[in-house]
């Protein structure tokens, strides 16, 4: 007949220990010319070295694993709450982190361009040559309550101008409409700035390609 056997012993899974967000951020390297994250941004994404250097100077970027880059999400007081993760084979957000806003440019700027990804915010800043009256922000994909609250705070500033610089697709239009409503409710001015291609990084790469061809055409 059937003889029951004692259950096989199994090791309890060891819980993964996550170090505090700020500690994990500080343990990562700062991108430098020629480093994996720097090459990803400048070679694969076409972002000028000068723009990446400014983002690094503002403390916004870190080296991620396997050649990826991390882009900081901070509260208005500067506290780090999470980061976007982007690489050739990877796209994600900090485990245990929170989405608020990636902020690139003058913190007190009255003009705020809202994008969906840090790379798009940096790309738009490059296209607009780091326009000095503009803060380029990213919600990190999606739309968290903290992101909306932060955008409302920016829109409530005196003479605030809210620019919906979201992607050129249906979801981008949905986010743009949310921004239009926020502007109407806070009294900020509003504009929709739509990339010609899918997103601002696509537009930047097209622009960089055209600029690279100009000397050849002139010599031709």
Where are these regions (language model features)?
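Phosphate-handling DNA/RNA-contact segment within nucleic-acid enzymes
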Residues: 62-155
């Amino acid at each position: 007949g059937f003889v029951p056997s004692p259950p096989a012993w199994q090791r309890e899974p060891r819980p993964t220990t996550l170090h505090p967000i700020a500690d994990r951020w500080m343990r990562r390297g700062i991108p430098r010319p020629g480093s994996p994250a720097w090459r990803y941004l400048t070679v694969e994404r076409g972002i000028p070295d000068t723009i990446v250097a400014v983002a690094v100077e503002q403390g916004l970027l870190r080296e991620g694993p396997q050649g990826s880059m991390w882009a900081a999400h901070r509260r208005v007081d500067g506290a780090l709450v999470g980061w976007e993760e982007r690489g050739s084979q990877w796209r994600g957000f900090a485990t245990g982190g929170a989405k608020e806003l990636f902020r690139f440019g003058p913190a007190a700027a009255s003009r705020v361009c809202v994008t969906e990804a840090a790379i798009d915010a940096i790309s738009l800043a490059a296209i607009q040559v780091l326009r000095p009256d503009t803060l380029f922000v990213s919600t990190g994909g999606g739309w968290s309550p903290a992101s909306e609250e932060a955008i409302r705070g920016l829109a409530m500033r005196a003479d605030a101008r809210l620019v919906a610089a979201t992607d050129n697709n249906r979801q981008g239009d949905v986010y743009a409409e949310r921004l239009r409503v926020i502007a109407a409710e806070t009294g900020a001015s509003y504009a929709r700035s739509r990339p010609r291609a899918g997103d601002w990084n696509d537009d930047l790469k097209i622009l960089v390609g055209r600029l690279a061809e100009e000397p050849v055409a002139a010599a031709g």
